[in-house]
């Protein structure tokens, strides 16, 4: 039986999944309260506004949200068009947040800093399920207050929690606070151009965010002499990222891998495999400061001095002088605010335990993750759910449409409609469309999202290239076999 029905369901985050949750709750007659840390809905999406999704609009708009919007006279975008992050905000999230139903229940500049049961820490069990949730919120003036809730959906995402570039999941010495290390999606050809033009960049990471940045740098190098590019991956080779080429079901994804392979084999990009980065230290006096945020954007048009990146690679010692390091190493969930909530998390992926085997990137790509709903997302504290990208923990296989289905199912469960909650369905292409994977548009050169799913062709022969310098000066050996697929076959020692 539901308790505290007079209280709202707090939704943490006003991104696509958070706003979809509010829409589904409203359709079920349940009062939502959406708390967004940013100044407006979709703040995290706006941070990568220059990125074009590969998933067309038909998969980017939630059904309940669409019904709210259509009641206002909203005109839906072309279902087959590919939006940028900025367009997703402008044409979907902003109008959705402005609907009378959502606007009255949305609080921006309201950062959730802690969640607990009212009057009970994590250790208290007696009567726990009858207690309301207590959500501690930091407002725009820095003051904190509490909001009482009957249930909580944490849709805060992972954008502000990038993985470090250092080895073993820990920041390299000198990494924390370094103005040289950017976030995963800098606007190489736009706002952040001065940070990369005519300079030496090391990109660290094995996903499509890394590939997108690398290809943008290759394009920049055509116009800006002296632009040099190195790429470090932790795995044995990039075979999986190269994908299926012309055999790929999604042409833009296949083209992404083909372009990247060509850039490596031609020597435009220097690849180091089995890379462990231990230290990042300044070289000489700094040439200025660059305040780089999570998206790699900056308000200061000067760049820092060079750094020396040290560690090891498959071929031996790594000792590389660069001007910028792009950390495209993925994300992890921020669990600090959930310390007083009883969670059942998988120790590897940091997703709900029941979901972990379905999304583990060692075994699954986005197209092989089955639809799932409330039953797999529940935690020991009844009425608390982590949804959206954060529900996948460290797994990069999240689909935006999957998040919409998650919150539809949870809203049904909170309304007492068990049958609807358990009837989980998802309409997607056979290959899936991963919301976190990115590529370059084959015609315009703009950034476009791609699926994470693909075939893995046989590795090509290794090629020796250098980092825009005389042969032998850096001498990274390159290969074409990928990350975790290779890790499964090779002992990391």
PLM regions with names:
Residues 63-65, 430, 442:
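Juxtamembrane/interface motifs at transmembrane-helix termini
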Residues 53, 69, 73, 365-366, ...:
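Short alpha-helix boundary/capping motifs
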Residues 51-75, 124-129:
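Flavin (FAD/FMN) cofactor-binding and adjacent substrate-gating region
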Residues 438-493:
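Long, low-complexity intrinsically disordered regions
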Residues 2-44, 50, 81-435:
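Flavin (primarily FAD) cofactor-binding/catalytic cores of flavoenzymes
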């Amino acid at each position: 039986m539901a308790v505290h029905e007079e209280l709202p369901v707090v939704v943490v985050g006003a991104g696509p999944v958070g706003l979809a949750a509010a829409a589904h709750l409203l359709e079920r007659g349940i009062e939502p309260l959406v708390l967004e840390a940013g100044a407006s809905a979709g703040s995290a999406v706006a941070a990568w506004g220059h990125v074009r999704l590969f998933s067309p609009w038909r998969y980017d708009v939630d059904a309940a949200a669409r019904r709210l919007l259509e009641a206002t006279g909203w005109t839906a975008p072309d279902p087959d068009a590919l939006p940028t992050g900025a367009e997703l905000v402008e044409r979907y999230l902003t109008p959705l947040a402005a609907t009378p139903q959502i606007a009255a229940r949305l609080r921006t500049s309201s950062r959730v800093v802690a969640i607990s049961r009212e009057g009970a820490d994590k250790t208290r069990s007696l009567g726990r399920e009858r207690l309301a949730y207590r959500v501690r919120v930091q407002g725009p003036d820095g003051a904190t207050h509490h909001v009482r809730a009957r249930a909580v959906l944490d849709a805060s995402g992972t954008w502000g929690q990038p993985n470090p570039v250092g080895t073993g999941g820990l920041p390299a010495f000198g990494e924390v606070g370094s103005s040289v290390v950017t976030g995963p999606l800098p606007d190489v050809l736009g706002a952040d151009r001065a940070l990369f033009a005519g300079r030496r960049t090391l990109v660290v990471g094995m996903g499509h965010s890394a590939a997108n940045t690398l290809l943008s740098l290759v394009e920049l190098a055509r116009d800006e002499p002296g632009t040099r590019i190195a790429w470090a991956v932790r795995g044995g080779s990039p075979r999986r990222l190269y994908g299926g080429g012309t055999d790929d079901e999604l042409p833009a994804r296949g083209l992404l891998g083909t372009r990247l392979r060509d850039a490596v084999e031609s020597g435009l990009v220097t690849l180091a495999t089995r890379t462990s980065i231990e230290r990042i230290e300044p070289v000489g006096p700094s040439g200025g400061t660059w305040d780089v945020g999570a998206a790699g954007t900056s308000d200061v048009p000067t760049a820092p001095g060079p750094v020396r990146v040290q560690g090891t690679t498959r071929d031996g010692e790594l000792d590389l002088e660069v001007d910028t390091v792009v950390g495209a190493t993925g994300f992890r969930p921020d669990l600090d605010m959930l310390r007083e909530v009883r969670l059942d998390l998988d120790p590897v992926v940091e997703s709900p335990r029941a979901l972990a085997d379905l999304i583990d990137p060692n075994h699954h790509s986005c197209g092989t993750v089955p639809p799932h709903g409330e039953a797999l997302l529940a935690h020991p504290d009844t009425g608390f759910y982590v949804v959206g990208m954060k529900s996948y923990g460290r797994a990069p296989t999240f689909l935006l449409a999957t998040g919409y289905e998650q919150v539809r199912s949870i809203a049904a469960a909170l309304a007492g409609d068990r049958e609807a909650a358990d009837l989980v369905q998802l309409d997607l292409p056979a290959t899936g469309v991963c919301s976190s994977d990115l590529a370059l548009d084959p015609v315009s050169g703009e950034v476009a999202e791609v699926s994470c799913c693909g075939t893995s062709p046989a590795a090509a022969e290794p090629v020796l290239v250098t980092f825009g310098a005389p042969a032998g000066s850096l001498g990274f050996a390159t290969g074409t076999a990928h990350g975790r697929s290779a890790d499964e076959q090779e002992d990391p020692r």
